[in-house]
Amino acid sequence: MLYWLLYEKLYPFFRTFRIFRYLTVRTAFASLTAMLIALFIGPWVIQKLREFQIGQYVRDDGPQTHLKKTGTPTMGGILIVIAILLPTVLWSDPSNPFIWVAVFSTLAFGAIGFADDYIKVVKRRSLGLTARAKLLCQGVAGTGVAVALVVLEQFRFFSTRLTVPFLKQWRPDLQWHLWPASLPYLALLAFVPFVVWVILVLMGTTNAVNLTDGLDGLAIGCTIIAAGALTVLTYVSGNVVFADYLELQHMPRVAELTVFCGSMVGASIGFLWYNAHPAEIFMGDVGSLALGGAIGTVAIIIRQELLLPFIGGIFVLETLSVILQVGSYKMRNGKRIFKMAPLHHHFEQLGWSESKVIVRFWIGALVFALFALTTLKLR
């Protein structure tokens, strides 16, 4: 809205406001605004969560050192969502449809996380939503994102072609071109592979961030790095000069998502101030699912979802550790690969301090993200 006011309306009278035309300037302001919102509202949110006795439940089958965290205010993801969305609305172009797709995804997955946290914390059911109910809700939210993008594809704002890392020319299309355009209702079936793909990507990212959120500041620190990488990727994908030079799919309207990514970085930095070890607040599922939905949606829109294993490398490793642990336990008569899963608990059991695990995983996340950016030229 500030973009509309300062540039669209007041620029003819105050030429200085011309700077708000530039995406980099608005991204910087959005990031700073998001960080300040999180920093200044954080203490109030923590106080209110304590007043309502919304505290973390710690299972006794996890690391025993975590039992002291019982009662720490949780559901702090509400603060993250507010700190992301307000600056996005303030500093982005409200006529850009991709902004609203990202906002919808963040809110939808955040709502699923909120319901899960509410059941766990308020209703005192330790496991929250059942796995089936959670996956169903995630599928519905993912379908909503996919349908919105299909509509935008019809207006030629979006492409269903994938960008494949390391390959310049091969861009497989996630549409089935089996039906003639003269049969519009039948032709809609062409988008089934794309819709299924979007649902799977969003389920993967949301649950991966959720699994990583097990140590103070771990998930939010990795999110800062992943969102920073997405900020760069979004900007170059929307800039005709950079996209042409790097031979990326150029979609001019996706550039506005740089503001959204900047807000995500700023909000995450502000939240980390209170979530750093020893944490004063936890994000809960409302935060992890909202962030996972935001990361996955941005990657899908800029057609870089195949880079997600590198952009969010730690998220992927954490998820793989759980899959391997469960698979090994079921298929090898109770034998485990790791001392405990997810992966960060394995290193705790090896004797690493919580702070050491967190910082080393952040370093790993940074290395993965930097490699993701180098793939733009390694093709």
Stretches found by the model and what they are:
Residues 69-81, 133-139, 354-364:
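Select subsegments of transmembrane alpha-helices in polytopic membrane proteins
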Residues 2-45, 80-111, 147-170, 190-379:
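Alpha-helical transmembrane segments
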